[in-house]
Structure formats: C-alpha cells, structure tokens
UniProtKB/Swiss-Prot annotation:
Protein name per the record: Succinate--CoA ligase [ADP-forming] subunit beta
Enzyme Commission no: 6.2.1.5
Coiled coil: none
Catalyzed reactions: succinate + ATP + CoA = succinyl-CoA + ADP + phosphate; GTP + succinate + CoA = succinyl-CoA + GDP + phosphate
GO cellular component, one term: cytosol
GO molecular function: ATP binding; magnesium ion binding; succinate-CoA ligase (ADP-forming) activity; succinate-CoA ligase (GDP-forming) activity
Domain ATP-grasp: 9-244
The organism of origin for this protein: Syntrophobacter fumaroxidans (strain DSM 10017 / MPOB)
Disulphide linkage map: none
Group of enzyme by EC: ligase
C-alpha cells in the first residue's frame, strides 16, 4: 500500500524525523491560507499523487509571493500530471502540500527497507540526492552505501555512524543524522514498511538535517495489524480494476498501453504468458493470477474484470490444471460470458486435471472461443485476431 507525501511526513513527525513546516491543502483557498500561515517566502507548492517525477512534470513549484501561491495552486489542482511513473494517462491532482522553502546546502538520499536476499533490514544512502536512485545504482553503483541490520540484534549506534561517515557529514550534523536514522528504523519495523525513502534528505546552511521529501510503502499482507494506516489509503490513486480484483482475492495489475487481457493460474506462468504475448507482437493489458485454488466464482469475476477494460481487444486464458481443475475454470468462463457477454476474441489453452471435461463444457456452451494447442500457438492466435 502506498500513501501520499504529506501522510508520510505525518508519520515522520510522529517519530521525531525533522520535516519542513507545512500542511496539506485540498482547495486553492486552503493553499493560500497555509502560505499565509507559514509567514515567509518562498514556499513550495507540491502536487500529491502516488508517483515520483512530479517536479519534472510541472507538479512542484516555488512560490515567492502570495500571488504565486494562488497562481500555482490553481494551475496544479485539477491538472492531469504525467510523469515517468504514471504512464501516459497521468494522474489527476486532488491534493497539494504547501511547505516552507529551506536554505539547502546539500542533497542526500536515504532509505530503509527489508532485503529479501539477506533477510535483513538495509539502509541505503548516497551523496547523489534528489536523483533517481535506480539510475544512480545502474550508472554509478559505487556512490551507494549499504548498511545491513540483523533484525534479531536490532539497530545499533555504529550502524548510523557507518552511514554518517560514508556520507561525509560534518561532525556537527552527525548527532542529528544518527537520531533520524534510528527513528526511521523504528518506523520501518513498527509498521511493516516495504520502503521508507527520503529523496532528498537535505542539509541546510543553518546546520539542520531535514526530510525534504518522503515516501512510504507498506506490506499489504501486514495491513490487518495497522488499522490506523489503512485510513491513509486513497482509492482515487489506485486503478479501479485492481480495487475490484482485490475484493475477490485476485492478483491483478493493470499494464498501461496493453491490448491483450490474460488470465493465468500461477505468477510464474502469468509472467511467462505476458512475455510470449509481447513476442507475438501484441502487448499484455494486465497481469492476472487467479491462483492455484481459485473457485468458479473467482474465475468468473476475473474474466468480468478483464472484459470491463475498454483497452482490451482480445483475451488469452492460459491454465495448467492442478488444484484449479480445468472444468472449474470452464464453468467460471461460461458463467461470466452469460452475465457480461463476450465482445472480443478469446483464446483458451488448457492442460492438466479434468482437461477433457473442461473442453466439453466450453464446446457445449455455444460460446465463440478459440482453442490453442500450446502457449506459443495461443499467443500467435490472440495477437492475430486482436490485430483484426
């Protein structure tokens, strides 16, 4: 689960991580009121969406007067902000964060997250702050410092010192920095975070260490433990198809720009199916893993969700029947087709448990379905019919 920057900063403040003075605003009038309350200029007007790259997309502006706060708030609120993370469709901006400007001397990068490879918590830091950390890691990996923490032993002072010295901090800043790092570790572990990121973490000319930006992602599987965090969820920032799929415990991810819907059982098979669709000259419109033990109802709802996407020009169903028997899949597809109708070509490749019963159910259904002998054949057929 993702949250907005202003919500992340509320958690930072709760844990004693220094942040700029500021407040969220949901209207132009509220933005102007926050600017007036801050009392000094410049102030920063920032779009609040669940995506990075807001500055390059025109979603972050430095206002040097009350008139500019009004101008920028009017320009950003209600805009469709397109960044490298939103896809070409962009995101509608419904919230702003208005903050004080700071006398920045240096920008750093700092994050903490679980590392699956080592089963430890890792801090990542870099003097290349304010940049895309993936780009830094790819081009200049030597600029990234990593400090691993065994959760059994917990965070110790020497971990913070290792980061501070690696970032070449001035001695007078180390105490502030170390306190911040300890707080971020506690925040990450208390709330089952999958990522806590500050980019940039700024050093000011008056010797302060401040989280200028904030990003926190949470482990969805742990949200039952954190009812307070669930209240931060913004459904407007989530894909409506993904929200609908989650109601039926389906693993669905929308793929921008795709035209072939697909339903598969098993994450590995789903990813391989998406690759084969791409190789056949089409583009997958979604990732949908119905799971090994899906019911006919889940199959029905998965199929319905795929067909509800107007971008979908064809559907590929690729099932290897094990726990999910082929006859159960067939019944789910038939029920979904009866309820919502089939407006696009559908190619089905089935193998495994009760495959003959499944094929018989589909054959007797009267539905215009295209059978495929294997995955490659299925991908070629759906790509061909989708192209018309």
């Amino acid at each position: 689960m993702k949250i907005h920057e202003y919500q992340a900063k509320q958690l930072f403040q709760k844990y004693g991580v220094p942040i700029p003075r500021g407040k969220a605003a949901f209207t132009v009038e509220e933005a102007k009121a926050v600017g007036a309350e801050l009392g000094t200029f410049p102030v920063v007007v920032k779009a609040q969406i669940h995506a990075g790259g807001r500055g390059k997309g025109g979603g972050v502006k430095l206002a040097k007067s009350a008139a500019e706060v009004d101008q920028y708030a009017k320009g950003i609120l209600g805009m469709t902000l397109v960044t490298h993370q939103t896809g070409p469709e962009g995101r509608l901006v419904k919230k702003l964060l208005v903050e004080e400007g700071l006398p920045i001397e240096k920008e750093l990068y700092l994050s903490v997250l679980p590392d699956r490879g080592t089963s430890k918590i890792v801090f990542m830091a870099s003097e290349a702050g304010g940049m895309d950390i993936e780009e830094v890691a790819a081009k200049t990996p030597e600029k990234i410092i990593k400090v691993f923490i065994d959760p059994l032993l917990g965070f110790k002072g020497f971990h913070a010192n290792e980061l501070a010295y690696g970032l070449n901090l001035k001695p007078e800043l180390i105490k502030q920095f170390n306190a911040m790092v300890a707080a971020l570790y506690k925040l990450c572990t208390d709330y089952d975070c999958s990522l806590v990121e500050i980019n940039p973490l700024v050093l000011t000319s008056d010797n302060r260490v401040i989280a200028l930006d904030g990003k926190i992602n949470f482990d969805d599987n742990a949200m039952y433990r954190h009812k307070d965090i669930q209240e931060y969820r913004d459904l407007d920032e989530e894909d409506p198809f993904e929200i609908e799929a989650s109601k039926f415990e389906l693993n669905y991810i929308k793929m921008p720009g795709g035209n072939i819907g697909n339903m598969v059982n098993g994450a590995g098979l789903a990813m391989a199916t998406m690759d084969i669709i791409q190789q056949a000259g089409a583009a997958p419109a979604n990732f949908l893993d119905v799971g090994g033990g899906a019911s006919a109802e889940q199959v029905e709802n998965g199929f319905r969700i795929i067909l509800a996407d107007p971008a979908v020009k064809g559907v590929l169903i690729n099932i290897f029947g094990g726990i999910l028997r082929c006859d159960r899949l067939a019944n789910g597809v038939v029920e979904a087709a009866k309820k919502v109708g089939i407006r696009v070509p559908v190619v089905i490749r089935m193998e495994g448990t009760n495959v003959e019963q499944g094929r018989e159910i589909l054959a007797k259904s009267g539905l215009n379905l295209i059978n495929a002998k294997d995955v490659a054949d299925a991908a070629q057929k759906i790509a061909a019919v989708a192209k018309g």
